[in-house]
A protein has these predicted regions:
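Active-site-proximal loop->helix
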Residues: 1-48, 131-144, 148-151, 242-246
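Short glycine/serine/threonine-rich phosphate/pyrophosphate-binding segments
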Residues: 1, 12-16, 97-111, 131-132, ...
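Active-site/ligand-binding loops adjacent to catalytic centers
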Residues: 43-44, 50-54, 113-202, 243-339
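Glycine-rich beta-alpha junction loops
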Residues: 62-65, 101-105, 125-130, 149, ...
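Active-site/ligand-binding-proximal alpha/beta "capping" segment
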Residues: 49-104, 108-109, 169-204
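Hydrophobic beta-strand scaffold residues
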Residues: 3, 26-29, 57, 121, ...
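Conserved acidic residues
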Residues: 27, 55-56, 92-95, 119, ...
Length: 339
């Protein structure tokens, strides 16, 4: 059994280099036209592959096991993280969980946290492609978050806010976090502790996006010091040196200096606000309905199955199927062990 990866050709060179270390055949990496937001082109390629009955398509945007895994694993893991911090902060509450939508796997942890703590669930997307915010479209460079459509596994009707983050913000803050001059600015002018500066150096573009969205959420909701916001650093900086070099060549040909670092930090971190939508019931139905055009019209999901997801009963029954899924995994593991 060979694994085949299908992803846009505009992704970083480092991402492709990482994949190349894991495949035995170069043709097992299929590059589709476009950038991060060109998801439809991936589906088209998968439709071609699916014509061969020997191929099994694993679509993280539509297979509910992705939702279940994050709800059952990521959610409790984040709960334990919060509880550990809260033990030292009596009275602390969990106000929100913030996650870029991507395939809508990680954001499923918000359902678990909402059940346990009553927290809000915040969906994040690139401002250059404001699908959830405005039914919009466009290209962007926040690699790791998909858009131009609403994933089938996204429990839209339990989402509370949507936040847009510009790829200009993530690109330029990446420059601050990854350069000596940027780190020196954070230490000397902003008094950021060295441990935090070191941690920021590990963050990739979608990780920075999530952090900015968490800041926007806290500011929009007017949260205080005892109202926590949880987010996740979903990728690493080691995936983006080529993108960073391209940014410097494009905008900082004469060098990235302390003034550039200060301007980037002031504009994109200290000025992180706006493009936040608190969802009404009408907004939720609008976003839910938008998924019709991908899943029913283009990909043939039966309308009845599509509509069933509008009710929380569907999602509760999905969670109830977890023991069956665990049994299937155990059966597969045993079969692999015998082989």
């Amino acid at each position: 059994c060979r694994g085949v990866a299908v992803l846009p050709e505009g992704m970083s060179a480092e991402r492709f280099a990482w994949l190349e270390r894991w495949v035995t055949h170069a043709e097992d990496i299929i590059r589709t036209p476009g950038t991060e937001s060109n998801v439809r082109e991936i589906y088209a390629e998968c439709e071609v592959l699916a014509k061969d009955p020997a191929n099994q398509i694993l679509n993280q945007f539509s297979q509910f096991e992705n939702h279940l895994a994050h709800r059952a694993v990521t959610g409790p893991a984040l709960s334990r993280c919060f509880e550990r911090v809260a033990r030292g902060r009596p009275g602390m509450t969990l106000a929100a969980f913030v996650s870029a939508t991507g395939s809508a796997g990680t954001i499923a942890a918000g359902d678990y946290l909402k059940d346990v703590f009553g927290s809000r669930t915040v969906a994040v997307e690139a401002l250059e492609c404001p699908t959830l915010l405005r039914n919009g479209y466009g290209a962007h460079n926040i690699q790791g978050i998909g858009d131009k459509h609403v994933p089938l596994i996204h429990n839209v009707m339990r989402t509370d806010l949507v936040v847009g983050v510009s790829d200009q913000a993530t690109d330029h803050l990446d420059a601050v976090f990854q350069t000596e001059v940027g780190r020196a600015y954070l230490a000397s002018r902003r008094r950021v502790p060295e441990a935090i500066i070191a941690a920021l150096g590990d963050f990739g573009l979608s990780a920075i996006c999530n952090v900015l969205a968490a800041i926007k959420t806290a500011r929009y909701l007017g949260l205080g010091p005892d109202e926590a916001v949880i987010t996740v650093a979903t990728d690493g900086a080691d995936l983006y040196p080529s993108d960073r070099r391209a940014l410097f060549a494009r905008q900082y040909a004469e060098g990235f200096d302390a003034i550039d670092a200060a301007e980037a930090f002031g504009r994109y971190m200290l000025g992180a606000e706006g493009h936040v939508l608190e969802l009404s019931e009408v907004d939720r139905h609008r976003i839910f309905n938008l998924g019709y055009f991908t899943w029913v019209e283009q990909l043939g999901v039966p309308l009845e199955d599509f509509e069933a997801r509008r009710s929380q009963r569907f999602w509760r029954e999905l969670v109830a199927s977890l023991p069956e899924l665990d049994a299937r995994i155990a059966e597969m593991d045993a079969e692999v062990a015998r082989a």
